[in-house]
Amino acid sequence: MQENAYFCTVIHYYITKRKDVTAPEYKQLKAFARVDGALLAVLMIACFACYIAGLTSPLYGFLSIVAIVMMPFFAGIRLKRFRDTGLEGSISFMRGWAYICLMFFYGGLIFALAQYAYMAYMDKGYLVMTITNILALPENAEVIKQLGMADQVSESIHMLQAMRPIDFALNMLTTIIMGGIMLGLPIAAIMRRTRPLS
């Protein structure tokens, strides 16, 4: 919760310092971002489920990649909806960027909880075992040996085996937040509009 408060405070500081958003507008921005973050989390959970299934089925692996590619477009569509319905068609770059950052933050929190629940109670070592088996296949082992990466791969597998479910979840949360910060820049620039809808 302290991390949540800190992240929201940083976003609030940057957008209110520029006099871009009043307190009620910031409250509205966070409310819309929470809802859209929950929807984004559903997409992330579906992507993760397809990834797990995709370890043994190429079709699900492909669907996982499609879901990852869809996330920035989904975020852009939801920002456009917020701009057109909540702000009457006008949004600044900074407000759009803050919206995307918060949406990925809230979505990342929900997804991290879901991933923690999966890794702690359902996985039972399946993920690491499947990755180990894939890397141990003769054709993959030969490529790893030719590249001189046998020690690095072995060390990486040991690190994966030593990771706790909370470590997986926190790593993913950090990745999602950083991804949201970076993806928010082009999305906010594209969706920026200074003229309200007529």
Protein language model annotation of sequence segments:
Residues 22-26, 191-198:
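Short, charged juxtamembrane terminal tails flanking transmembrane helices
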Residues 101-125:
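C-terminal halves and exits of single transmembrane alpha-helices
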Residues 39, 43-47, 71, 107-115, ...:
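Alpha-helical transmembrane segments of multipass membrane proteins
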Residues 155-178:
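Individual transmembrane alpha-helix segments
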Residues 122-162:
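Membrane-interface interhelical loops and short interface/amphipathic helices
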Residues 5-83:
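Transmembrane alpha-helical insertion/packing segments
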Residues 31-35, 39, 95-107:
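Alpha-helical transmembrane segments of multi-pass membrane proteins
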Residues 77-95:
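Membrane-helix interface/capping segments
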